[in-house]
Amino acid sequence: MKTNLFLCLLLAVLQSAFLANADSMKQKRGGGDTSTIDLFAGLKLQQAQYMTDKSNSPGFTTENGAPSSGYFNIQRAGQDGPLLIQSTQMLDSLAHFVRERIPERIVHARGWGAWGKFEVTTDFAEKYSFAPAFKKGAVHPILMRFSTVGGQSGSPDAARDPRGFAIKIKTKQGVLDWVFNNTPVFFIRNPLKFPVFIHTQKTNPQTNERDPNMVFDYLWQNPEASMQFMRLFSDLGTPYGARHMNGWSGHTYRLVKQDGSWVYVKVQLFTDQGIKNFTAAEATQIGGENQEWATKDLFDSIEAKQYPSWTVKFAVKTPEEGKKYRYNVNDLTKDWLDATWYEVGKMTLNQNPRNYFDEIESSHFSPSNMVPGWAPSEDPVLQSRLFSYNDAGRYRIGSNYNKLPVNCPFNTVGNYDRSGVMPVTGDYGNQPIYPSSAGTYKPASKDETVAPLIKLYNNATIETYVGEATDIDYEQPRYFYQHLSANDKKNLHSNFAGAMSKVTQPNVVSNVIKMFNKIDPNLAKGVTAAIAAAKKG
């Protein structure tokens, strides 16, 4: 996607979505004269400035746009006297400086990304969904943001950690967010375990250090997390940047037809660059030398016009097939081992951000951003994310997070959500704030929406759900381990040992080894031997 295309899209949004009702801006002046005030004139100038090359910067001004003789000019009472409070340029600059950062994400704080396009290359999805977004030949602008999960914003982006793989697809029917990871499973299936699990991935509340005691104490008490831990401590846990890893939906979603019929779907993005990972030693060295290694790798490849791409594929199951599958199709700790993947399209990144804070840090993704024809499953973790992600956006950016240019749809928006902090697109002008008889937003036609889903839970009763682990939770980790090469098994043993040798609570180590023995006795033996070797030095 070329830079000027992005500018045109941004300006189109501003002009069509928010300036369509220009007559409402007309102000009656004395003498009967009528003039039209363009509320967005300054905003459009600043948007144009955003796309201006840095060699053609405008003159220096204060925050309110007044010409200024220089940034370092301060007013004081003589050369040795106190500063004057009327030195407002200094006061404004210092006040702005201490507010330059919004709260970092609770998880996925270290991130990087780029713009690109999603081309639908087949008609496979059309068989199961009426979504225009998935029609063969459709092309959509996208934003991808990659991230580590547990680290803070300044942590190494090559660290051993799952990678966030978030994609914002700007369709003509609204924004579709795919908030994926670089792994087909996750650590939890009960959403209430997420806060406490993340606590174990952060720092000890007393020492403020990463604490392997917490990490492995959580693991042995929650064996359903073992599949994700196996992937994390293999070399897959240290991918060679973002370009050489796959992305997975993890959750099961639904593709929905207009009559309300549906199938389960999972999504995988297969890297066209080939899978490539660091060893533990390489990742440690890279992280020590350059904490932004993956960020630089992606940026430099796009600058060199070596555009990374991924082939998008879907796997589907009918409701009947879902019931017959050995594992719960909505269990986030389980993969679909029998999946057949069908090509849907291709995603290509071809434009770097001009401003990281504005386009990447200020980006917001939520699985609740859906379009007709795409729907959530009853996966408990996904259901919880439908609320928590948008709520995180309200906390981090404010209630108008979807009005920032990076997040706003590339189509008009009409609803009754109003005001709040910084409604930068004009707060819908004088359009109705309730369903007015004098004129209101026109509901979408039946052709644009989907019939209500069929009843799934007739006579359902309220029950307590915990999602306790059972023997079936060891099957997929066993399959994963037994299909590793001898060298990959050796690295897995060594990687586990590198972390577990630092555990100071003996019962934690012994309980983890017992859990490994249930997965495969050779895993338990290999890790035990590697821990002994690590302690010997």
Task: Identify the function of each model-found stretch.
Residues T3-L19:
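Cleavable N-terminal signal peptides of Sec/SRP-targeted secreted and luminal proteins
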Residues K2-N4, N21-G537:
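Active-site-adjacent core segments of small-molecule enzymes
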